[in-house]
Amino acid sequence: MEVKTFAFLQIAVLIAFSLHSASAGSKQPGAAGSSSDSVEAVFCPTNCTKGTNGAWSGCSDDCICVHVGENTEGSCMKFSGDYDYPTPEA
């Protein structure tokens, strides 16, 4: 009985250690905002609306429309930095 309990505890510790090691990774902490691939998002002064044809309008060329769920109104935002945001084809 003691051998089975001891073996079970060894396996449990091994699994816990393995999960922690896998999730911790090897990333070193850095200063806030020091990431080389950080993105800055700023609200533009305009809002956007969804038309009857399903197209969004109201944002300038350098801003995109962001909305929540099925809302037909949204806010325009401008992103700057290293990001790969897909542009919808018109």
UniProtKB/Swiss-Prot annotation:
Record flagged with keyword Cell inner membrane: no
Residue runs in coiled coils: none
Disulphide bond pairs: 44-63, 48-65, 59-76
Subcellular location: Secreted
A GO CC annotation given for this chain: extracellular region
Sorted UniProt keywords: Disulfide bond, Glycoprotein, Secreted, Signal
Positions annotated as glycosylated: 47
GO terms for MF: C-X-C chemokine binding
Signal peptide: 1-24
Source species, domain of life: Eukaryota
Entry function: Salivary chemokine-binding protein which binds to host chemokines CXCL1, CXCL2, CXCL3, CXCL5, CXCL6 and CXCL13.
Protein name, UniProt field: Evasin P458
Organism: Ixodes ricinus
